Amino acid sequence: MTKKLTTVVEDIYDRIGVLGQGETIDVCDKDLDKFAEFMKQALKDWLTPRTNREPTLRMSNIGKPKRQLWYDMNSKRESQGIPSPVLIKFLYGHILERVVLFLTELAGHKVTDEQKEVKISGILGHMDCKIDGEVVDIKSASGFAFKKFRDGSLPDDDPFGYMAQLAGYEHSEETTDGGFLAINKETGELALFQPDELDKPNIPFKIEELQKIIK
């Protein structure tokens, strides 16, 4: 039976629930090796700092407030670097997101198009993946931020522009029923949030508007 994105959280809970009853889950070596290789690459990437690059519009930032974007693009101040605790947070957040995808596949859902490059009107981005044919952004979140995904209030409080990012990837892929699969870093709880189409911004218009403002 073909799985649907709408049941992914329930299916993950059902699949791993047997562990709590003393039953073993068999996973083939190929899948274990794939997971281990990702962890290895994640550590390599984390241990190699990115060189300073010129600020530019990207799919990951087009949803931020216009004033903030203009300042980010035009500010001449020197970078202060990233604090060590934040670097650690980036690492385990990245690892947790991979754990979520491992569990998704373990539960029988199809994961494709991981880190696929997307380009709209010259704006580049890399989507996290598709699950069962729908664009999905994987998020690791604090308990407070997780509530936005669990109760669906993200469109009303989206300071990082996640909605625009999702809408951009969906526009490129010509899909409409994607969403966010989030994990609570504090409790391990999962939540799937699929926004209504009316809550998503018009991406071609938004990009055109931003490109006029930010030279």
Which residues fall in each region the model found?
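Active-site glycine-rich loop that binds ribose-phosphate moieties when present
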Residues: 157-165
